Amino acid sequence: ARHDRNWQLAYSLIPKCKLYEGMEEVLAIIRNNNINTCIVSTSPRTYVDKVVDYFNLPIQHIVAYHDANPVKPHPAPMLKALELLECKAAEAISFGDRVIDIQASNAANIESVACFWGTKEKSELIHSDYSHAIVSPKEILTLIR
């Protein structure tokens, strides 16, 4: 539904989505340690807001499709995230499951992490110029502690 931009259908499917195994632990640590976070998405803000609310994600900021131009792979959305986070690129880390996530992070001089669970771009992502590669959500903890 998201790829077809059928947002009403996408909204209705959110309750059918589940967090990946290990993600609840990661989110609890982010929440308990007050780690400042931002979602940078190519989806519209309404969709991202609904996902954040449904899963009660500990997210302080969102940069959605219409919030920065040009969109990923351009660094503009990542630079907007740094501005919202009041953070320098050298102090940030970015996790993404698409090549454009890695490209945008790298272009903004942000340490990039390729996330290989659930990606539909595995063969492309493996050849992207990421700083780190991880295969499960729990590995996020080794990079944010």
Language-model segments: residues:
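Internal catalytic-core helix/loop-beta-alpha segment
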Residues: 38
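Metal-dependent phosphoesterase signature
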Residues: 1-27, 33-35
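Conserved phosphate-coupling serine/threonine residues in phosphotransfer and NTP-handling enzymes
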Residues: 41-43
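Asp-based, Mg2+/Mn2+-dependent phosphohydrolase catalytic module
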Residues: 28-31, 35, 45-145
